[in-house]
């Protein structure tokens, strides 16, 4: 079966510093019209908005936004791939662009309620009670949430701009922004790509990075740090203001968010090195090697903060957050640096590494992990077809 046509990511516009893209889909149509007049194409925001305005005029197969073939961008001068991107490199970048938009969408929701709403990351007005529960994990959580959101916006914007500069189709998932928003005060009432209100969070990353003898690349299955999170469906943001009334329930929501932050960013930490092994051109490799480590920085930050989640039982659903320091080094909270473990072959000495980094089916593995997380609950069959098509194309890429 032929893969669905790749689509193009677009971000939304708010008057702001010219170098920061914005994510406000509720105002997108009006802002796109304004952006066509005089915005500088070197701006991340204006570049993507112009692409949106053009792409909207050229609906492709299945109703997905496609860029017209004419002059997607002026040819790169030096440093870039001569003759354009290889099919495989373009497929990898398109999948990563889609992944970054998905990340942007979920981080935007967290920022609206518990981050800092400003000109860099506008949207929403905050939920003081939820933000206070989040701050139990660290007093600077609002700044970290804001900055993680801004980083993901920049990743999506850059990758799409690079694709366009080399005559390849950028990606746009806007037609799939149909999932409901939180009804809690502070959240924008706009369509979303992701669902943060019915999550099933895999916390095996916690024990994976603390093990000195196991590695998923060898087929090892690591235990859950918070077993309950992987065994049900739980909100990581308040669904409505009713979720703010019971203190332990609200803290459980904040704790869930803390571990979800880790889950999302450990995925990116592995995905970039996994796909880097499949690229052909040195500059595309440079992109993956430059963005990937920022995901690792996010992951380590959130690992430190999640360790501060207070042990408790949610009185509304029985979700238990255990004392992670009660069972030894496998879950000890201050062990946030990757424990040396087996790599490549067991005959070699153990070494501190990112894991997994096996490249086979890496993109589809990421899609499956996010789906199992509950992040796409409520999404359409077409959405899954598009995302899996992008993943298959990325996984089919071959180096050289």
Where are these regions (language model features)?
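Membrane-interfacial loop-to-transmembrane-helix junctions in polytopic alpha-helical membrane proteins
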Residues: 41-44, 86
């Amino acid at each position: 079966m032929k893969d669905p046509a790749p689509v193009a990511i677009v971000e939304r516009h708010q008057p702001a510093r010219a170098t920061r893209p914005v994510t406000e889909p509720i105002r997108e149509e009006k802002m796109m019209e304004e952006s066509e007049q005089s915005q500088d194409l070197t701006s991340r925001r204006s570049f993507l908005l112009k692409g949106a305005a053009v792409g909207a005029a050229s609906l492709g197969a299945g109703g997905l936004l496609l860029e017209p073939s004419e002059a997607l961008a002026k040819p790169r001068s030096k440093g870039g791939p001569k003759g354009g991107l290889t099919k495989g490199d373009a497929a990898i970048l398109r999948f990563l662009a889609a992944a970054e938009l998905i990340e942007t969408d979920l981080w935007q929701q967290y920022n609206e309620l518990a981050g800092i709403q400003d000109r860099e990351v506008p949207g929403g007005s905050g939920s003081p009670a939820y933000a206070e529960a989040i701050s139990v994990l660290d007093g600077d959580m609002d700044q970290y949430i804001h900055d993680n959101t801004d980083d993901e916006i920049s990743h999506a914007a850059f990758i799409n701009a690079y694709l366009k500069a080399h005559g390849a189709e950028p990606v746009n998932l806007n037609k799939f922004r149909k999932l409901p928003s939180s009804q809690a005060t502070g959240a924008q009432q706009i369509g979303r790509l992701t669902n943060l209100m019915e999550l099933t969070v895999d916390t095996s990353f916690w024990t994976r990075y603390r093990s000195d003898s196991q590695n998923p690349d060898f087929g090892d299955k690591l235990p859950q740090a918070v077993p309950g999170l992987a065994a049900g469906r739980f909100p990581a943001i308040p669904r409505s203001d009713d979720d703010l009334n019971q203190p332990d329930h609200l803290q459980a929501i904040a704790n869930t968010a803390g571990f979800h932050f880790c889950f999302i960013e450990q995925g990116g930490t592995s995905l970039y090195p996994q796909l880097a092994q499949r690229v052909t051109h040195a500059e595309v490799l440079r992109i993956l090697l430059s963005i990937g480590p920022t995901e690792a920085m996010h992951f380590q930050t959130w690992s430190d903060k999640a360790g501060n989640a207070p042990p408790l039982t949610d009185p509304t659903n029985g979700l238990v957050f255990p004392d992670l320091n009660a069972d030894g080094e496998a879950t000890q909270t201050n062990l946030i640096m990757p424990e040396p473990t087996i790599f490549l072959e067991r005959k070699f000495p153990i070494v501190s590494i990112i894991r997994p980094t096996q490249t086979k089916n890496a993109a589809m593995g990421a899609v499956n992990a996010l789906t199992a997380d509950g992040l796409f609950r409520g999404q359409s069959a077409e959405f899954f077809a598009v995302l899996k098509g992008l993943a298959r194309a990325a996984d089919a890429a071959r180096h050289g």
